[in-house]
């Protein structure tokens, strides 16, 4: 037989990579806990619309699934499965050292440098019970020493229904209806003359669309030995494959680093995002889910009646709302704005001994408006249906951390850390 000699090359560069862990960093070669890392430069070419999608298929033991597939919807992330039947299973999210309430689609993925997922008890223990479901560490881009760089990043993509269901067309549907009528002894239900006047609607074509997604970002970065700055402005628009659904996001970020003295430095970040989400009715509970009614509406059903009103289907015990009317008239709009601001002051007391003070704030404001008019069967049952809600919350956090990190020789090093955290939450 043939002999194949294979020589593996050591990837020393990967071992020297710095991984972000709780309240610090460590070289990958020195890492002992279960931590998965994603460099955004490796996934940015895919054209992801939100930060959480960057984790899909990238880290072992981390499940990232869509909830309903609506544009702008936050993904469901599970680190090594679900740990609680009654409590929450979402991991803790930490952006540039600041724990945040939740991961929304309003976090601009173009601003992210890397993401680390802390998976085991030794890695998440420093966060206590908050880290019981894992911790997702997000590090954003910062300025570097050198010339000022003005950069534009953008992409355009399309999405469409992968495969339509093979449903009956007009002729096959009429043949089936007549066969059922004859078997019942009632004769032909639809004559050829009547059939000639009936439409042949493909409700899947009428309910779904080829959706366009586009994102545009302008960023400026650069700095000197003492001052470094990164700023970005982003706009993203994502259409859903169901007509009437879409998501728009506007995001602004400014990250700055300043060397105040030989042993004193300041880091600051501020990020603002504003998102608008219009969702299609996706529930299958009799309220007229578009995906459901596009399957059960008869191809010979008119889109509108003689009065110009949308028709509704009553050919099943559950009924059905016209999917075209639902896409046009159903309104479910959510607006969310979020402000994240944090600042870190670091003082090198002696060689290896550093004291750091962090202060941060998260302010979130959201509103939701839902309306089903009386012209749709789902709304007609209630003589129309409308709801409105608002939610506002803020988080303030202060951390005081003392770290001693000393490397004595090639084989011996010592790292000690102690601190106290104060956090308040108002809903």
Predicted segments, located by residue:
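An active-site-proximal structural segment forming one wall of the substrate-binding cleft
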Residues: 353
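Short, small/polar-rich motifs associated with maturation and membrane association
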Residues: 1-273, 282-284, 340-341
């Amino acid at each position: 037989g043939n002999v194949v000699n294979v020589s593996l090359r050591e990837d020393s560069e990967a071992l020297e990579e710095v991984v972000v862990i709780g309240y610090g960093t460590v070289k990958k070669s020195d890492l002992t806990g279960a931590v998965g890392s994603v460099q955004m430069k490796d996934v940015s070419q895919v054209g992801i619309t939100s930060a959480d999608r960057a984790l899909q298929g990238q880290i072992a033991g981390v499940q990232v699934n869509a909830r309903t597939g609506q544009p702008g919807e936050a993904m469901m992330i599970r680190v090594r499965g679900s740990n609680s039947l009654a409590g929450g299973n979402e991991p803790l999210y930490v952006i540039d050292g600041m724990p945040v309430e939740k991961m929304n689609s309003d976090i601009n993925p173009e601003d992210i440098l890397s993401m680390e997922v802390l998976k085991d008890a030794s890695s998440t223990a420093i966060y206590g019970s908050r880290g019981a479901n894992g911790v997702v560490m997000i590090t954003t881009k910062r300025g570097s020493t050198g010339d000022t760089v003005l950069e534009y990043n953008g992409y355009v993509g399309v999405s469409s229904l992968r495969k339509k269901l093979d449903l009956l067309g007009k002729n096959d549907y009429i043949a089936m209806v007549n066969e059922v009528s004859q078997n019942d002894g009632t004769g032909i239900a639809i004559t050829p003359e009547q059939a000639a006047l009936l439409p042949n609607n493909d409700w899947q074509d009428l309910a779904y669309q080829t959706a366009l997604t586009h994102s545009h970002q302008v960023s400026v970065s650069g700095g000197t030995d003492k001052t470094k700055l990164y700023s970005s402005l982003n706009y993203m628009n994502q259409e859903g494959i169901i007509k009437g659904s879409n998501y728009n996001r506007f995001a602004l970020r400014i990250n700055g680093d300043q060397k105040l003295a030989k042993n004193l430095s300041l880091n600051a970040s501020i990020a603002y995002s504003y998102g608008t989400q219009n969702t299609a009715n996706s529930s299958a509970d009799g309220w007229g889910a578009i995906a459901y009614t596009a399957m059960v509406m008869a191809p010979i059903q008119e889109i509108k009646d003689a009065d110009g009103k949308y028709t509704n289907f009553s050919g099943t015990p559950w009924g059905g709302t016209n999917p075209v009317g639902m896409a046009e008239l159903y309104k479910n709009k959510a607006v969310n704005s979020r402000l994240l601001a944090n600042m870190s002051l670091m003082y090198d007391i002696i060689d290896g001994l550093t004291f750091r003070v962090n202060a941060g704030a998260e302010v979130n404001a959201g509103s939701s408006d839902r309306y089903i008019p009386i012209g749709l069967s789902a709304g007609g049952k209630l003589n129309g249906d409308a709801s409105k809600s608002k939610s506002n919350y803020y988080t303030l956090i202060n951390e005081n951390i003392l770290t001693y990190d000393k490397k004595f020789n090639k084989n011996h090093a010592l790292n000690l850390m102690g601190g106290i955290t104060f956090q308040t939450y108002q809903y």
